[in-house]
Amino acid sequence: MAKRSILHMFDPMPNNSPFDINMALDAGFDVLMPYSNVKLETIHNLTQDAIFSRSPSASKKTAIFIGGRDMGMAIDMLQATKPAMVPPFEVSVFADPSGACTTAAALVACVEKALKQHHGKELKGSKAVVFGGTGPVGIATGVIASLQGAETILVDHLSIDSAKDAAKQYNRRFGATMSGGVARNDEEKAALIADADLVFCTAKAGIRVINAAVLAQAKQLKVAGDVNAVPPSGIEGIELNDLSAPLNLANQATNAVGVGALAIGNVKYQLQHELLKMMLEAEKPVFLDFREAFTKARTLV
């Protein structure tokens, strides 16, 4: 009898994400096994239980997905699986906490494409501001943009120290060069975007972060991307399906365009589907996080 494909879903939170479960089933996995409240120190043993219970030939039909809501923890868990592998007993692993890796990759890829198409510019050398920058999507967005050469600021809505700490932590981990900023009010938001080329809005759903008055202070804005699909939009003037639509509220910034949440979400959905399929189809184990996600996202926009 043919071996069925199994996805072991490790999550440090009390519940696994129904979104990820649906995506994994639709990508072709036969059996999904969710694990909640998983501790970092248990990853090694869980991984070895997964690899040694099937023959090396069946390893291609076994994979691990790491969820949760903490980017650092998810990457730590992914790294913890690697020394647990004993070739030829090894499986593929994909970390995507709260969909942060795939959402961020889709967001940056969409903004990058718009930047090239409408302004003939690259991420390298651009100034990027990430609102909601201390959350998982914001952190991944910031790291991706920074590694591509953008001067990147992670923005927290309450504390400059939180933003600086996040930037320092992830700079050290991934070789990025981000800085921290704070936006407690419209004046601070306006100061941050005044000379920004790119604005990424990755704040909580249903919160208007950038209003028309703030946008009007942007003097060199080229592209803004908003991942908030719950009204009101995170950036006023960007509609859900906008894909490089004129951002007229940024009236000091010539030819500024916006990318909306559903346009980004369509790429994110395709991307997560493709990365899950990649684990099923790979001849050799793959280890996937936001870096591999961004590489793939560029082929989908």
Language-model segment annotations:
Residues 1-89, 291-301:
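N-terminal ligand-binding/catalytic initiation module
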Residues 2-3, 230-301:
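Adenosine-phosphate binding glycine-rich loop
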Residues 14, 69-73, 99-103, 133-138, ...:
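Gly/Ser/Thr-rich loops at beta-strand to alpha-helix junctions
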Residues 86-94, 124, 253-255:
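Glycine/charged-rich beta-loop-alpha catalytic/anionic-binding loops adjacent to active sites
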Residues 95-113:
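A glycine-rich, Thr/Ser-enriched phosphate-binding loop motif common to dinucleotide/cofactor-binding enzymes
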Residues 104, 135-141, 163, 207-210, ...:
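Short glycine/serine/threonine-rich phosphate/pyrophosphate-binding segments
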Residues 114-198:
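Glycine-rich phosphate/diphosphate-binding loop of Rossmann-like nucleotide-binding domains
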Residues 176-258:
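Rossmann-like adenosine-cofactor binding region
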